[in-house]
């Protein structure tokens, strides 16, 4: 493999994956989200796989509504498909603090968020995730209802520690890509070299989460693996 990302999704049946997308996902995709998805593919090609798939987006939207989230965090934005999803799901006075080092990717998504009239909900911080989270912790104290993490997998343990100080008791922290294209069950020599560091980091992260008494967890086999952590203490 030449550094390309595999198609996102751990379902091995392409026919079943296509059925899910065509029957329940694409028909429910917001038109402007569809336009953003297509614009991301056009600009980034294979790297567009870094965005969340449509079925996962629908799940996140419903989750945010079920827990009545109003104040949320997103760590890792890319072109903002998941950010846009959450912004649409939040009430009019909802707020998202989004952190990413890449202003250009965010700007691509921002034009679609403006068309939808949800850009006022977003506070974008151009920063790497570590410094951005430290900035939030050192700034005005706020409680967050929900956090979505799709950033450097080698820092997931660090992100967990920081977010447990920011997300309220009973709030949800969602970590994306926790099954990492299905490579966690492969032998190391079967995994493309450019994917091994994240594979090792996620193997360790999943073990840590499994025994962490501060959170209740559920790992969901949607997209590339999504782990929900509900803060208990």
UniProtKB/Swiss-Prot annotation:
A divalent metal cation binds at residues 150, 176-177. Signal peptide: none annotated. Expressed in inflorescences and flower buds. Not detected in roots, leaves or stems. Located exclusively in the tapetum of developing stamen. Its cofactor is a divalent metal cation. Pathway: Aromatic compound metabolism; phenylpropanoid biosynthesis. Keywords: Lignin biosynthesis, Metal-binding, Methyltransferase, S-adenosyl-L-methionine, Transferase. Its EC number is 2.1.1.-. Binds 1 divalent metal cation per subunit. GO terms for biological process: lignin biosynthetic process; methylation; seed development; spermidine hydroxycinnamate conjugate biosynthetic process. The keyword Transferase applies. It is an enzyme of class 2 (transferase). This is Tapetum-specific methyltransferase 1. The lineage of its organism: Eukaryota, Viridiplantae, Streptophyta, Embryophyta, Tracheophyta.
């Amino acid at each position: 493999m030449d550094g390309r990302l595999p198609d996102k999704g751990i379902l091995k049946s392409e026919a079943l994956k296509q059925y899910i997308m065509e029957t329940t996902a694409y028909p429910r995709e917001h038109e402007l989200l569809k336009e953003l998805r297509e614009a991301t593919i056009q600009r980034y090609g294979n790297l567009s796989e870094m965005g969340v798939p449509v079925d996962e987006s629908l799940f996140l939207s419903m989750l945010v509504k079920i827990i009545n989230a109003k104040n949320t965090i997103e760590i890792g934005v890319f072109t903002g498909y998941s950010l846009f999803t959450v912004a649409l799901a939040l009430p009019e006075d909802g707020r998202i603090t989004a952190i990413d080092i890449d202003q250009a990717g965010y700007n691509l998504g921002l034009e679609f968020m403006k068309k939808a009239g949800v850009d006022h909900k977003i506070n974008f911080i151009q920063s790497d995730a570590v410094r951005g989270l430290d900035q939030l912790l050192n700034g005005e104290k706020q409680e967050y209802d929900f956090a979505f993490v799709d950033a450097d997998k080698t820092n997931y343990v660090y992100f967990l520690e920081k977010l447990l100080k920011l997300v309220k008791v009973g709030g949800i922290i969602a970590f994306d890509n926790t099954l990492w294209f299905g490579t966690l069950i492969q032998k190391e020599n079967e995994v493309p070299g450019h994917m091994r560091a994240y594979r090792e980091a996620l193997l360790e992260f999943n073990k840590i989460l499994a025994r962490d008494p501060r959170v209740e967890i559920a790992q969901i086999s949607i997209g590339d693996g999504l782990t929900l952590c509900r803060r208990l203490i």
